[in-house]
């Protein structure tokens, strides 16, 4: 899983459509749709909070380095957040909140700056 490129790969209209299909029925959304929605949301996070202080991982779909501040240049970043696709999309759309996901163990965060509270919900519906 490599960090997202600096250029968008998913056209925003297609990404929003994938997110809407997922929102309508998360359990019935095809895997390819979930993948597109996750990647679109990661690209959107990168676009709104560029930087290299924090790495957000949503395996197996993607990862992005974002948020301004001290950056790392080698190895594992000091600030990492990892979660599954359902948790990521729930957070992005406002269907769950950061504190609840962290307390519930569906988000794994390590590092002093490993938080997304200032950036969520990213794409509320």
Task: Specify the residue positions occupied by each region the protein language model found.
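Feature captures hydrophobic
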Residues: 1-125
């Amino acid at each position: 899983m490599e960090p997202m490129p600096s250029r968008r790969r998913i056209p925003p209209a297609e990404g929003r459509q994938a997110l809407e299909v997922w929102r309508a029925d998360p359990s019935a959304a095809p895997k390819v749709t979930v993948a597109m929605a996750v990647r679109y949301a990661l690209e959107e996070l990168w676009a709104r909070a560029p930087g290299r202080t924090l790495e957000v991982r949503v395996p197996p779909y993607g990862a992005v380095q974002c948020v301004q501040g001290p950056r790392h240049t080698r190895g594992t970043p000091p600030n990492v957040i990892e979660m599954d696709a359902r948790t990521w999309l729930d957070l992005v759309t406002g269907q769950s909140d950061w504190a609840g996901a962290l307390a519930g163990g569906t988000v794994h965060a390590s590092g002093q700056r490993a938080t997304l509270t200032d950036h969520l919900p990213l794409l509320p519906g």
